[in-house]
A protein has these predicted regions:
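Alpha/beta catalytic cores of nucleotide-metabolism and tRNA/nucleoside-modifying enzymes
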Residues: 191-199, 208-214, 218-256
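Glycine-rich phosphate-binding active-site loops on the catalytic face of alpha/beta enzymes
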Residues: 40-51, 117-121, 126-129, 171-177, ...
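N-terminal amphipathic alpha-helix/helix-capping segment at the start of soluble metabolic enzymes
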Residues: 1-18, 79-85, 256
Length: 256
């Protein structure tokens, strides 16, 4: 069993995402350390990919900046090992099937384990193919995180019943990015999930203000924020750690 459940032991969880290697690997390490210091309960580390289909323009551009800087999957593993020496909160990777295929499931997951990572999120992994990856991940105590999008009640329950670590509930169809308003009936999706599993539920895609975080954490176990953090990195570059710290703290304070 992974340590992901630790993220949900101190009340509502704030989960932050950042692209590894943007603006550079050293600053990335500082940014992720400041995220933990600001109150992140779990960090999603994005392994950059040239065609991140689930991402909106903010994270797509971060992936391209990182790749142009020479970031590789191996360098992300090394970066994560350094981060693991500085923070003790759970860490998960977010990447795409192509990255796993090229690397090989077993070798990727072995390196993820050695880097101190507890889970992987693969947005383009079909639910029907999840077991193949999870069977390898089980060898290394790594959870393959399930994503639940607005869909039929039966499918929501099927995906949730099989989930490990936490359930990433997608607030709206489409790509990641900041939204001023989320119209999906997330309350009913979360209640469908909770009717079949005790696995914690976190809501992501579009959350960027303390008010939104407070609203959705009222019925979910945590909130996930990516684009708003990545946007601060794009805006402030090497000076981003202090801005990210302040932002994370404001979001965590809102859901306490």
């Amino acid at each position: 069993m992974s340590n992901i459940s630790d993220a949900f032991k101190n009340g509502k969880a704030f989960i932050g995402f950042v692209t590894a290697g943007d603006p550079d690997l050293d600053t990335s390490l500082e940014i992720m350390t400041s995220m933990a210091q600001g109150g992140c309960d779990l960090i999603e580390i994005g392994i950059p990919f040239s065609d991140p289909i689930a991402e909106g323009p903010v994270i797509q551009e971060a992936d391209l900046r990182s790749l142009e800087n020479g970031t590789t999957t191996d360098k992300v593993f090394e970066l994560t090992k350094k981060l693991r020496e500085k923070v003790d909160i759970p860490l998960v990777y977010m990447t795409y099937l192509n990255v796993l295929f090229k690397y090989g499931y077993d070798r990727f997951l072995q390196n993820a384990k050695d880097s101190g990572v507890s889970g992987v999120i693969v947005p383009d992994l079909p639910f029907e193919e999840k077991n193949e990856l999870q069977s390898v991940a089980d060898k290394y105590d790594i959870d393959v995180i399930s994503l639940v999008a607005p869909t039929s009640e039966d499918r929501i329950k099927m995906i949730a019943g099989d989930a490990k670590g936490f359930i990433y509930t997608v607030s709206s169809m489409g790509v990641t990015g900041m939204r001023s308003e989320i119209t999906t009936d997330l309350g009913s999706i979360v209640s469908h999930i909770k009717s079949v599993t005790d696995t914690p539920v976190a809501i992501g895609f579009g959350i960027n203000t303390p008010e939104q975080a407070k609203k959705y954490s009222a019925f979910a176990d945590g909130v996930i924020v990516g684009s708003a953090i990545v946007n601060l990195v794009a805006e402030h570059g090497k000076d981003a750690p202090k801005y990210v710290y302040d932002y994370v703290k404001s979001m965590k304070d809102a859901i306490k």
